[in-house]
Design a protein with these regions (language model features):
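Conserved acidic carboxylate
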Residues: 6-7, 75
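Two-component/phosphorelay signaling modules centered on CheY-like receiver
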Residues: 7-28
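Residue-level signal for the "D+5" position in two-component response regulator receiver
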Residues: 28, 50-51, 86
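Acidic, metal-coordinating helix/loop segments flanking the phosphotransfer/catalytic sites
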Residues: 28-41
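Conserved phosphotransfer microenvironments
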Residues: 43-60
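A short, hydrophobic beta-strand element within the central beta-sheet of small alpha/beta folds
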Residues: 68-79
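C-terminal output helix
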Residues: 97-106
Length: 107
């Protein structure tokens, strides 16, 4: 399974990696400009540098290369669920991440 995380925050990366207990290829990017390959799952932080996570989801959703990728927005608060739905994310996870909810993304 190919997993990409777009975030500029180290603790978000660490919290995702500590719960992945299966075989995977992981790519960590600090911005959406660096995304070149297709992935099974693309996790996007709510805020990355000066770019909002919802706009990154919208941007990569326009590229057919990512049509089969599951795009998951990592939200800061429950109120951000609206943003995830509005931009067409395939799912969302509330930070800090927990194992139970992360596992639901993969099932």
């Amino acid at each position: 399974m190919k997993i990409c995380l777009i975030t500029d925050t180290e603790w978000v990366k660490d919290s995702l990696l500590k719960y992945l207990d299966f075989d995977y290829n992981f790519t960590h990017l600090i911005g959406s400009d660096d995304i070149k390959l297709s992935y099974d799952y693309i996790f996007v932080d709510m805020q990355v540098n000066n770019n909002g996570g919802p706009s990154i989801i919208r941007e990569i959703s326009r590229d057919n290369k990512f049509a089969n990728s599951k795009k998951i927005l990592l939200i800061d608060r429950e109120a951000d669920i609206f943003q995830a739905k509005r931009v067409g994310a395939d799912g969302h996870l509330l930070k800090p991440l927990d194992k139970t909810n992360l596992k639901k993304v993969f099932t």
